[in-house]
Structure formats: C-alpha cells, structure tokens
Amino acid sequence: MDLKTTVLHITDSFTDEEMYCLLFLINGCIPRSCNAVNISDLIIETLSKSTQWDICLMQCLYVLRKIGLLLNLFQVTKEAVKQSFFTQPQLETHVLTLVNVNNNLTAKDEKRLCFILDQFFPRNVAAPSVILCVFSNMLCEMHVLECLCQLKKCLKQIGRSDLAKTV
C-alpha cells in the first residue's frame, strides 16, 4: 500500500469541505496558504512524517464516518465481500468494532496483542496495525466471526476484558 496512491484514491470522492476536515484531523490546523488545489499534497506531506500513516488515515476516516473508504483502505474489494458471505453493511460494522478497539489500545497492549495474534494471523499485509492485519485475515481463510472470537480471547488474555466486551 503506497501512501500517495492510497490518499489520492481515497480523497478522489471527497468534497472540498471533507478535504479540509481530513487535513484538520491529520495536521491539527489548516495552514493559511492552503487551498483546494494543494490540499492533497499537504495531507500526503503530513502523513509521510508518520511511520503508521495507515492507522492515522484509518482513524480519520472513522471520525469522518467514511466507512466505505475504510473498507477501501483495508483493500476490501467487491469480490472479497462476496467471498466472505457478508454484506457491505455487516463488514462496515466489523470495521467500526475493530477501529474502536484499535483506538483504545495502548502501545504496550498492541505489542502484546501482536505477539499473541501472530500465532493465528501471520502478517500477510504490509501494514503494522494489528487491526489491519486481523481484518485482512478475516476476509481470507478464517470465518469473520471466528476471527472476532479469537480477537476477543486475545484481548482477555492481555487483560483488556473491557475491550473484549465491545467485540
């Protein structure tokens, strides 16, 4: 997943107002020199400074309620939706659950969770995020609900029963 291509693909369907909102979420402010022409470049430039730009982008899309685009970020295709026997709205619900869990994990939690989950989900995605990894695997070999059950068990194992209840 390439940063520039991903951002341009995602923001292609955004209105100017949504672009400014996205820039504000990523950058924390909207520079005076910013205009509708260079806004994509500013978003890409800001995200390129982050080692986990995919997680940052994922959280912004979640805040903006661009759930269809979140699925896009997870590289969910129409074929993958058909293959998983789930409808788009059902997958969107699972994405919201996963992003919510991701937003509430500490760095320590994430490291411990990675260690446990790697046994079940070898990383077949370039993304560093546990959640991206889990979701991409959901659409491959494992049934989605099995995958969520496994995540729930792992969250309990690392002492995050509070988050396990939300899955």
Swiss-Prot record:
Transmembrane segments: none annotated. Coiled coil: none annotated. GO terms for biological process: regulation of apoptotic process. Keywords: Repeat. This is Uncharacterized gene 71 protein. The keyword Protein biosynthesis does not apply. Residues 2-75, 93-167 form the DED domain.
